[in-house]
Amino acid sequence: MASLAAANAEFCFNLFREMDDNQGNGNVFFSSLSLFAALALVRLGAQDDSLSQIDKLLHVNTASGYGNSSNSQSGLQSQLKRVFSDINASHKDYDLSIVNGLFAEKVYGFHKDYIECAEKLYDAKVERVDFTNHLEDTRRNINKWVENETHGKIKNVIGEGGISSSAVMVLVNAVYFKGKWQSAFTKSETINCHFKSPKCSGKAVAMMHQERKFNLSVIEDPSMKILELRYNGGINMYVLLPENDLSEIENKLTFQNLMEWTNPRRMTSKYVEVFFPQFKIEKNYEMKQYLRALGLKDIFDESKADLSGIASGGRLYISRMMHKSYIEVTEEGTEATAATGSNIVEKQLPQSTLFRADHPFLFVIRKDDIILFSGKVSCP
């Protein structure tokens, strides 16, 4: 699975830098894996330059290990299917919903084999709709479907005015995550602290506290500490906390560097006193501008798109690509009482390393080596 892990990570970090540059130092949160799967869904029916641009953006030859199109297609599909099967197998340990839907104006007829592949491989919804005559009903129906699929967690993925009656095809991608820590933070130890950020001027944030053994690495270049916070279900959050400027870390984010920084040989199990903010980030992105900037242009251009493998009825292109993501980080774990008892014992031990996340930081959430989410907290 290393090849998909590498391709997804490079896609993730390239996209992160592009999105961060356009956020004005605000919070960033998205799921590279769900976007990777959404674009792989489009790739199933893409041809010529549309296909090659997707392949380049997703590093498909890296993901598949093969150079030609048919082998890379099957290699990519099989690896993604295994990843999602693995994620869903541990679903009882966390709340994770990933939703992909492709909605095209009714004059286009989806190819039967495309619908079957989309549903089988990516559990995606593929549907003909009436943007032209029933725009508001269509918008509400899409929103209701996403809300149902995410158990009410993600609502109004397409806001009023979010699509027009001239829309041809809309790609909707939504993801919700809430995990439970292996070792919960104790609510009584959460305190209000100042978060040192221009975006948080004068704002007090709820800072969780815990002192016990964590995996921690100290990196000299760029200067930072990386803390591993474990969720149930084999999912880990890695918090990249800079000593100085966060941009020094952002500029060096690559799959190879992240693997080196978080290598078990490098991360030492030690007593750490952790101060970590509660935060909730909900983002609704129109992805076209970011993906165009990274070279994926043709699928959004009526005169250039070749998505003839998806449907018949004329030149098909993507009018809108929506990505809505939601994460909530609280004290919650499997057994708060067990964590409390552990805290009492470990606080008697001296020489803890301090990890105080009271200024902007990056985080990556992984299952094994596959990045599920990445984000930046400028103000909790």
From Swiss-Prot:
Site (Reactive bond): K347, Q348
One Pfam family of this chain: Serpin
Swiss-Prot/TrEMBL keywords: Cytoplasm, Palmoplantar keratoderma, Phosphoprotein, Protease inhibitor, Serine protease inhibitor
Signal peptide from the UniProt entry: none
GO molecular function, one term: serine-type endopeptidase inhibitor activity
GO biological process: positive regulation of collagen biosynthetic process; positive regulation of glomerular mesangial cell proliferation; positive regulation of platelet-derived growth factor production; positive regulation of transforming growth factor beta1 production
Source species, domain of life: Eukaryota
Main location: cytoplasm
Tissue and organ expression note: Predominantly expressed in mesangial cells. Expressed in the epidermis of the whole body.
Subcellular location: Cytoplasm
InterPro entries: Serpin_CS (IPR023795), Serpin_dom (IPR023796), Serpin_fam (IPR000215), Serpin_sf (IPR036186), Serpin_sf_1 (IPR042178), Serpin_sf_2 (IPR042185)
Disease: Keratoderma, palmoplantar, Nagashima type: An autosomal recessive, non-syndromic, diffuse palmoplantar keratosis characterized by well-demarcated diffuse erythematous hyperkeratosis expanding onto the dorsal surfaces of the palms and feet and the Achilles tendon area. Hyperkeratosis is mild and non-progressive.
Family designation: Belongs to the serpin family. Ov-serpin subfamily.
Name of this protein: Serpin B7
Source species of the chain: Homo sapiens (Human)
